Amino acid sequence: MSEIKKVATRDSYGNALVELGKEHDDLIVLDADLAGATKTGMFKKAFPERHWDIGIAEANMTGIAAGVAACGKVPFMSSFAMFAAGRAYEQVRNAIGYPHLNVKIGATHAGISVGEDGATHQCLEDIGLMREIPGMVVINPADDVEARAAVKAAYEHVGPVYLRFGRLAVPVFNDEATYKFEIGKGIVLKEGTDVTIFATGLCVNETIEAEKMLAADGINAEIINIHTIKPLDRELVVKSALKTGKVVTVEEHSVIGGLGSAVCDVLCEEAPTKVLKIGINDVFGESGPALELIKKYGLDAEGIYKKVKAFVK
């Protein structure tokens, strides 16, 4: 049996930027002294004149990106999620969101999988923050194939886009030959009748593995990959919830404001359903090896399996 390929989606981001850079001269990449970590260094090596390192000044980088977009170019500004969505939030809101400028935000090192960097760098609130900005598209890809497709789709979309990437190498489960990405459209990975599990980001693969354990217990779960949290695929969410009658959401993010909240916003209006939100429960993260933290917070396959089983039974 061949070894499962693993790639960090931040690497996918860097590779996708290089490929886009070959095709589009209007692509400008900005970074805040983190080109090695965000992987925009790949773009810098290929197109040094179109890679601008602003230094540790994320608010300034955001304003510059807004200006670049106003001049007709397509900027991708890059930093850790904690800094892109956290430190520079006011500028993202007012300089990019309010005038609805065509800026793409590549936010890496999101969630607890940042690992040893600890709570100060483990951004668990970014999806919620970005969802609140009118007109902002929010994408959280699950693997290398999806992440590279998402970067391309973000370039083609006219308007602000927040792309969430991780530090941890995760399994590549999508088939590049057949995979199709569309902003705002969820993907049914497996149909089921007993419960729907909506997952996003690195939690998608863990949910796929959890489903195998659930199946062994006679629980027929429907698994849906929600790569775009805003705009959410309302039609698919409602259709699946009505079909199974029970809903679970799984995310490497606070249960407040993220995928779970987005799904509940839709269901309370269109299809009231019992929902279990699996994520980070209103606490800060902590320092530790990424895989150990994922297990501790119940976001690994076994943790998801146990919570869903108890919920369904």
Residue spans for each PLM region:
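Thiamine diphosphate
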Residues: M1-R164, A169, ...
